[in-house]
Amino acid sequence: MPRSLKKGPFIDHHLLQKVDAAVANNERRPIKTWSRRSMIMPQMVGLTIAVHNGRQHVPVLVNENMVGHKLGEFAATRTFKGHVANKKAR
């Protein structure tokens, strides 16, 4: 279920401060964050944000198509190693 429009988008305050500082200083280094729940805002376009997936930080280059989505959608938390082969089918 999507968030109510009257509440507006959610973004962690500390992440917004880091994004504003990076835009003001024209920095290209990745912004490291654990906030997977924060929504991607238009001022983040062009920045690289390292999103934590539970084990490591996954670099995510933000483009225009990602605006309105959550950061966690672009850093997978589970690795699928495939199904085990059926030994009886030989």
From Swiss-Prot:
**InterPro entries per the UniProt record, alphabetical:** Ribosomal_uS19 (IPR002222), Ribosomal_uS19_bac-type (IPR005732), Ribosomal_uS19_CS (IPR020934), Ribosomal_uS19_SF (IPR023575)
* Ubl conjugation is among the record's keywords: no
* Source domain of life: Bacteria
Name a single GO cellular component: small ribosomal subunit
Keyword line: Ribonucleoprotein, Ribosomal protein, RNA-binding, rRNA-binding
Pfam family membership, one: Ribosomal_S19
Q: Give one GO biological process term.
A: ribosomal small subunit assembly
Membrane spanning stretches = none
SUPFAM superfamilies per the UniProt record, alphabetical: Ribosomal protein S19
Gene Ontology MF, one: rRNA binding
Give the family, as the similarity comment puts it. Answer: Belongs to the universal ribosomal protein uS19 family.
Function, as annotated, reads: Protein S19 forms a complex with S13 that binds strongly to the 16S ribosomal RNA.
Protein name stated in the entry = Small ribosomal subunit protein uS19
The scientific name of the source species is Thioalkalivibrio sulfidiphilus (strain HL-EbGR7)
The major lineage groups are:
Bacteria, Pseudomonadati, Pseudomonadota, Gammaproteobacteria, Chromatiales
